[in-house]
Structures are given as C-alpha cells and as structure tokens.
Amino acid sequence: MNILDALDAQSKRTDLPDFRAGDTVKVHARVVEGNRSRVQIFQGVVIRRQGDGLRETFLVRKISFGVGVERTYPVNSPAIDRIEVVTRGDVRRAKLYYLRELRGKKAKIKEKREKQPS
C-alpha cells in the first residue's frame, strides 16, 4: 500500500451517512467567529458529489429569500459537525445542474419511497 493511501485512510471520516445527488440534507458546519465557535445549519438539495477519497466534495443548493445559494463542502472536513439526511430524492442523474434554471414546483424532486416488507 502506498504511503499516501495509508494517510488518506487514516483521515477519512466514517461517521457520515450515505447520501447522493437528489437527497435533501442538513449540514451542521462549525463556524469560527473571532474566539467563539458555533454550529451553522445549511439545509438544501445535494446537486453533485465529486472526487474520491480524501478530496471528495459535495454541492448543496437552497433557495434563500428567492435567491439560489450554493455551498461546496469537503466530505471529510473536520469543520463539518454532522450531516443529516432529511429526505431521499428519486433522480436519474448524478449531477443536477438543471435545477438552477427551474423555479417553483418544477424544481421539486420526487421523494424516493422505500419498499415496506410484507
């Protein structure tokens, strides 16, 4: 095993849930302001997951006061306190850039229903 691969394996986070493009998530990010630290929650739809290993990132989009806001987070960042999956989205694409042009009900993502055991 390569030395860099060993370092990557040590730094990778295992406490995060499994999520993908189309899911609505709440990202609890730690923000440092001066000498104080607080947790800021950013809730939105995952537009993409990009990269692999330690350098993997994901893009979250939400509409705030009628303006689209997008934030990119590194998956393995220590600044992320935790990630909550609010709903699972049923989409057929890995990158949902087309949501940027859609407004209102057209921008709504179908919710994935889990099959109940019978």
Swiss-Prot record:
S-S bridge residues: none
An annotated Gene Ontology molecular function: structural constituent of ribosome
GO cellular component terms, semicolon-separated: cytosolic large ribosomal subunit
Biological processes per GO annotation: translation
Keywords per UniProt: Ribonucleoprotein, Ribosomal protein
InterPro entries tied to this protein: Ribosomal_bL19 (IPR001857), Ribosomal_bL19_CS (IPR018257), Ribosomal_bL19_sf (IPR038657), Translation_prot_SH3-like_sf (IPR008991)
Family classification: Belongs to the bacterial ribosomal protein bL19 family.
UniProt function note: This protein is located at the 30S-50S ribosomal subunit interface and may play a role in the structure and function of the aminoacyl-tRNA binding site.
HAMAP family: Ribosomal_bL19
Name of the protein this chain belongs to: Large ribosomal subunit protein bL19
